[in-house]
């Protein structure tokens, strides 16, 4: 059990607990190029839904992962791009639910929720976490830099429509960025739009890891606190506690498997390697290898050095 292409983690999540990731999308295939994206700038912009990887391969790998007793709280379909671009998303959700009694969550940027097929497929999930941090076409374009003809009203209307028929848990995610959607006026506009959505929880977040664009400013604590009060939300504007886990046996490959989907800072990396019983010398050698790897970028942000795949 030392080679996993689609399954990663589990990783500690501020919302979901210990989250086992399923990634049905290749690296940085998305219909947005969000300024705050923690895995960097989108390389492949598209609105075309495809079966990027064979559904059977993903399911077989998941079966292999759970063949021995593993500890995780939820299965999250997310990863390296926008999961609703996967044309067999509905079948993937249904297949996973047949194999585990843990909830199946889908994290989406909301862009394709106007598509009736996407809506129908997502109805099979237990938890859907859509982004809802825009309140106008201008804010939509500034935050997400959407591809093609995606627009604010279309995506918003799709989210409202989906929320009326979804029977699971809908957890809205509001990412606040200073000077773009963080003013009192912005948040009041957002509140008016959110009133039309049937949701269970609303999470208030900001850029806690290095964003795609270095000029992005995280929202202040005062802004976060105001938004939490105004929207009756839950603040998650800090890093997760807990250790990362991987079933990949090779230590370096295990790190790569995680950071191409979820960047890690130096403390998280060290904790991960200590959990795998490495000596200080072995850990030092891995950090040196990461530093010399031309496919990895090391970014200083908020007092941490964060490692992610280019």
Protein language model annotation of sequence segments:
Residues 85-226:
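Conserved AdoMet/S-adenosylmethionine-binding subsite of the radical SAM
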Residues 40-77, 87-91:
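Conserved alpha-helical substructure of the radical SAM core
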Residues 27, 44, 82-83, 179-180, ...:
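Short strand->helix junction
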Residues 22, 34, 130, 202, ...:
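Conserved, mostly hydrophobic/aromatic
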Residues 14-57:
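Canonical Radical SAM [4Fe-4S] cluster-binding loop centered on the CxxxCxxC motif
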Residues 1-18, 60, 67, 182-310:
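Auxiliary Fe-S-binding modules of radical SAM enzymes
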Residues 76-82, 109-110:
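Glycine-rich beta-strand-to-loop/alpha-helix junction loops that act as flexible
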Residues 38-42, 71-75, 135-139, 170-171:
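Short, basic/glycine-rich phosphate-binding loops at helix/coil junctions
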């Amino acid at each position: 059990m030392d080679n996993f292409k689609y399954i990663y983690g589990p990783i500690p999540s501020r919302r979901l607990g210990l989250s086992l990731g399923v990634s049905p999308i290749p690296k940085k295939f998305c219909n947005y190029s969000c300024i705050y994206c923690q895995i960097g700038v989108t390389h492949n912009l598209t609105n075309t839904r495809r079966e990027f990887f064979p559904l059977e391969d993903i399911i077989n790998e998941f079966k292999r992962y759970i063949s021995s007793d593993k500890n995780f709280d939820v299965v999250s379909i997310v990863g390296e791009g926008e999961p609703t671009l996967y044309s067999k998303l509905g079948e993937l959700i249904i297949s996973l639910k047949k194999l585990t009694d843990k909830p199946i969550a889908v994290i989406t940027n909301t862009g394709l929720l106007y598509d009736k097929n996407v809506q129908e497929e997502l109805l099979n999930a237990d938890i859907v976490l859509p982004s809802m941090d825009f309140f106008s076409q201008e804010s939509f374009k500034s935050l997400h830099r959407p591809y093609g003809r995606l627009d604010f009203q279309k995506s918003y209307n799709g989210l409202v429509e989906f929320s009326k028929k979804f029977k699971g848990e809908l957890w809205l995610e509001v990412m606040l960025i200073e000077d773009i959607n963080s003013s009192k006026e912005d948040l009041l506009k957002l509140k008016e739009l959110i009133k039309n959505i049937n949701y269970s929880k609303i999470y208030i977040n900001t850029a806690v890891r290095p964003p795609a664009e270095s000029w992005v400013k995280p929202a202040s604590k005062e802004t976060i606190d105001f938004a939490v009060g105004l929207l009756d939300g839950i603040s998650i504007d800090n890093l997760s506690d807990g250790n990362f886990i991987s079933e990949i046996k090779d230590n370096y490959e295990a790190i790569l498997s995680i950071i191409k989907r979820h960047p890690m800072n130096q403390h998280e990396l060290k904790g991960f390697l200590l959990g795998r019983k490495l000596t200080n010398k072995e850990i030092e050698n891995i950090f040196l290898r990461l530093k010399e790897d031309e496919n990895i970028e090391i970014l200083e942000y908020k007092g941490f050095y964060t490692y992610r795949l280019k």
